Amino acid sequence: MHILKSTNALDITGNDAYTFVDSLVSNSINENEIKFSYLLGPDGKVKFWFIFTFRNNEVKIFQTEENLLKLKKLFEKYKIRINCELNILKDNTFFEISNIDETLMVQTSAISEKYFDWFEIEIMYELPSLNIIEMGLLPNEIKWLESFVDFYKGCFMGQEQASRVNFRGKPRRILKSISDSTQEIVRK
């Protein structure tokens, strides 16, 4: 179990906030839940990974400020005739991340003096950095497929391709963290 300190959030509010986000992200979420998710491209490749929550018709997405700025820009492209607002806020939130039975779990945590940042969490749990994502990773090439994708949720961007790679078999390559705190994609 590790504590992550997140300092920023993309706040999505308005009547269409939940349906807008739900139609784009790979994981389903219910009221008052906290989960991991991907935003996939139309080609099924991972564009972003993040933690998100849904409460009182408000969706909050947590990641680094750099990733949130890029994510907001991408969401703005899809926000046509959608009644919601997108704002990046300063938001100090602590999350407890744990690996339970090969499933990556997340929940809020009390304020902690010992915590890790997003980069350290990416290395520890072999989650893709933005540089690795730009190389074109498929969801099944990352260790935590079942924690980030709900294959029974229905439509989301990249869903058809993600389902194909999930049911097609073993990936050709996989993301690995290396002891010198870097990542690389290794052929299997």
What kind of region is each of these model predictions?
Residues 1-188:
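Basic, glycine/lysine-rich polyanion-binding surfaces/domains
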